[in-house]
Amino acid sequence: MREKIKLESSAGTGHFYTTTKNKRANPEKLELKKFDPVARKHVMYKETKLK
């Protein structure tokens, strides 16, 4: 089953993306490089819990 997750910016801007992931196939935490519109550059986004 796919679960909803939050990808939070490592730039400290508070910006985040939401997405889904299959926790059984990928149990480790997700890290992606995505665009942060607040910082106006590409930064690492790390998986956190969606509340």
Curated annotation (Swiss-Prot):
Keyword hit for Ubl conjugation: no
Annotated Gene3D superfamilies: Ribosomal protein L33
One of the protein's GO biological processes: translation
One Gene Ontology MF term: structural constituent of ribosome
Annotated transmembrane regions: none
Biased composition (Polar residues): 10-20
NCBIfam families tied to this protein: PRK00504.1, PRK00595.1, rpmG_bact
Family: Belongs to the bacterial ribosomal protein bL33 family.
Protein name: Large ribosomal subunit protein bL33
Protein source organism: Nitrosomonas eutropha (strain DSM 101675 / C91 / Nm57)
